[in-house]
UniProtKB/Swiss-Prot annotation:
Signal peptide boundaries: none
Record protein name field: Signal recognition particle 9 kDa protein
Alphabetized GO MF terms: 7S RNA binding; RNA binding; signal recognition particle binding
Keyword Ligase carried by entry: no
This protein's encoding gene: SRP9
Main location: cytoplasm
Any single GO CC term annotated in Swiss-Prot or TrEMBL for this entry: cytosol
Role description: Component of the signal recognition particle (SRP) complex, a ribonucleoprotein complex that mediates the cotranslational targeting of secretory and membrane proteins to the endoplasmic reticulum (ER). SRP9 together with SRP14 and the Alu portion of the SRP RNA, constitutes the elongation arrest domain of SRP. The complex of SRP9 and SRP14 is required for SRP RNA binding.
Keyword Chloroplast on entry: no
């Protein structure tokens, strides 16, 4: 289970993992108040990518990452619907 030290590396690897098989990929966001740590996991049951942070500025990056994944999901669904109707 590789734990990434930089956000850029993690986000690139997580996006690749999602694009490899969107139906198997999951994203888990976990916050521990006692430690003040935020943990993001992206997995497809074979590979598990982890990024942990205690910096408030990383929350914006994580929010942007989630919206990027949502856009990828919607774009993929829209393509599937148009292919089914044709």
């Amino acid at each position: 289970m590789p734990q990434y030290q930089t956000w850029e590396e993690f986000s690139r690897a997580a996006e690749k993992l999602y694009l490899a098989d969107p139906m198997k990929a999951r994203v888990v966001l976990k916050y521990r108040h006692s430690d003040g740590n935020l943990c993001v996991k992206v997995t497809d049951d074979l590979v598990c990518l982890v990024y942990k942070t205690d910096q408030a500025q990383d929350v914006k990056k994580i929010e942007k990452f989630h919206s990027q994944l949502m856009r990828l999901m919607v774009a993929k669904e829209a393509r599937n619907v148009t292919m089914e109707t044709e």
